[in-house]
């Protein structure tokens, strides 16, 4: 599997993504950043239930809430724009990981998102080691890619 398969995604900006001025509503950038890393782990081959807890079962005893997020808009993103979304995950420490997301239109960086997650035990809410599947995804994303952050 080539990193491009799970680290570069596409998204077309839809009418419902935009405000009355015809540009994306600010909250959508962070939503897209999160959806992109979810899609990335799916393409990589990690089942969602291995990362995201299921309220009906305690199969996954770890949760990964967002503890920090940022969005930077560098150029207007409008209805109909086709964006390339480049994902750069990295491990911060044993219980924190960060996903940097770059949104490009015609190879020009138009926005950036950053989301930091903390790995916690679902019951105690104490910090725990990142799930092995996430560790492998982060490692594979960083070792096998020839991409450079924008």
UniProtKB/Swiss-Prot annotation:
Record GO biological process: phylloquinone biosynthetic process
InterPro entries (alphabetical): DHNA_CoA_hydrolase, HotDog_dom_sf
Keywords assigned by UniProt, alphabetized: Hydrolase
Catalytic activity: 1,4-dihydroxy-2-naphthoyl-CoA + H2O = 1,4-dihydroxy-2-naphthoate + CoA + H(+)
UniProt keyword Protease, yes or no: no
Pathway involvement of the protein, from the record: Cofactor biosynthesis; phylloquinone biosynthesis; Quinol/quinone metabolism; 1,4-dihydroxy-2-naphthoate biosynthesis; 1,4-dihydroxy-2-naphthoate from chorismate: step 7/7
GO terms for MF: 1,4-dihydroxy-2-naphthoyl-CoA thioesterase activity
Family named by the database record: Belongs to the 4-hydroxybenzoyl-CoA thioesterase family. DHNA-CoA hydrolase subfamily.
Disulfide bonds: none
Name assigned to this protein: 1,4-dihydroxy-2-naphthoyl-CoA hydrolase
Function noted in UniProt: Catalyzes the hydrolysis of 1,4-dihydroxy-2-naphthoyl-CoA (DHNA-CoA) to 1,4-dihydroxy-2-naphthoate (DHNA), a reaction involved in phylloquinone (vitamin K1) biosynthesis.
Keyword Hydrolase: yes
Pfam families found in the cross-reference section: 4HBT_2
Residues making up the signal peptide according to the UniProt record: none
EC number from the UniProt entry: 3.1.2.28
Active site: 19
């Amino acid at each position: 599997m080539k990193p491009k398969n799970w680290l570069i995604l596409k998204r077309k900006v839809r009418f419902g993504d935009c405000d009355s001025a015809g540009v994306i509503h600010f909250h959508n950038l962070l939503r897209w950043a999160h959806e992109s890393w979810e899609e990335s782990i799916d393409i990589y081959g990690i089942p969602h239930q291995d990362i995201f807890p299921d309220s009906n079962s305690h199969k996954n005893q770890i949760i990964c809430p967002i503890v920090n997020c940022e969005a930077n808009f560098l150029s207007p993103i409008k209805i109909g724009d086709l964006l390339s979304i480049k994902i750069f995950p990295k491990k911060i420490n044993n219980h924190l990981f960060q996903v940097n997301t770059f949104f490009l239109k015609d190879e020009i960086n138009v926005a950036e998102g950053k989301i930091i997650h903390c790995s916690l035990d679902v019951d105690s809410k104490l910090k725990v080691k990142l799930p092995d599947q996430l560790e492998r995804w982060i490692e594979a994303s960083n070792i096998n890619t020839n991409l450079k952050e924008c």
